[in-house]
């Protein structure tokens, strides 16, 4: 589950960040983060026309290449994923350009032209872990339910660059496997996994399920 949020970065430093749910009071809110964006701008005391770039932690262009990889190799109806992109982007004269790691397009808001980058989900996870770390070079492993069509990425970070070495694609996902057990225990999958993590402190491996799962 991707929760709507916004963050403002100036000269490589995070100035403000806020999830939309804190402002609209809707748990796990997935609406366009208008209030969160306004909060960040107000926090930094700047206007929207002072923004140079916009980055999104998901690359919808990957979905334009094929349908659900669980069922088919090619997409049959692209409209299934159009809701991921605001209308003003879809109607833009410059179409979304496809790339393996990120896609971009330019839009005009008033007189200002903005570059919008759609970065693959797992690359964002990798950057979030590597760049704030004290390491100049490091092996990186990302694993969640699903990115665009990846479930696991093996990468290496070297100074200011991150290189993808290998990827695992859905449905082969340890994250989805974990979510299945979250639902089995009576919780909401893709939302309550943290509760299962907390419960694990009270568990014991000396039971009949341990060997079965292993």
Positions of predicted regions on the chain:
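Short acidic/glycine-rich loops and adjacent helix/strand connectors
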Residues: 1-214
């Amino acid at each position: 589950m991707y929760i709507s949020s916004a963050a403002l970065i100036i000269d490589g430093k995070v100035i403000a960040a806020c999830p939309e749910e804190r402002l609209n009071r809707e748990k796990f809110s997935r609406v366009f983060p208008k209030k969160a964006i306004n909060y960040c701008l107000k926090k930094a005391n700047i206007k929207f026309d002072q923004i140079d770039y916009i980055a999104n932690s998901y690359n919808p262009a990957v979905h334009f290449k094929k349908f659900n990889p669980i069922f088919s190799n090619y997409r049959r109806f692209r409209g299934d994923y159009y809701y991921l992109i605001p209308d003003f982007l879809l109607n833009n004269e410059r179409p979304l350009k496809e790339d393996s790691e990120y896609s971009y397009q330019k839009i005009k808001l008033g007189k200002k032209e903005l570059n919008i980058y759609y970065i693959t989900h797992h690359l964002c996870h990798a950057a979030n872990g590597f760049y704030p770390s004290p390491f100049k070079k490091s092996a990186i492993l990302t694993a969640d339910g699903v990115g665009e069509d990846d479930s696991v990425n093996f990468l290496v970070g070297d100074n200011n660059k991150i290189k993808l070495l290998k990827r695992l694609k859905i449905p082969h996902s340890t994250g989805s496997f974990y979510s299945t057990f979250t639902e089995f225990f009576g919780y909401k999958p893709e939302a309550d996994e943290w509760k299962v993590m907390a419960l694990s402190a009270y568990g014991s491996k000396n039971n009949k399920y341990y060997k079965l799962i292993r």
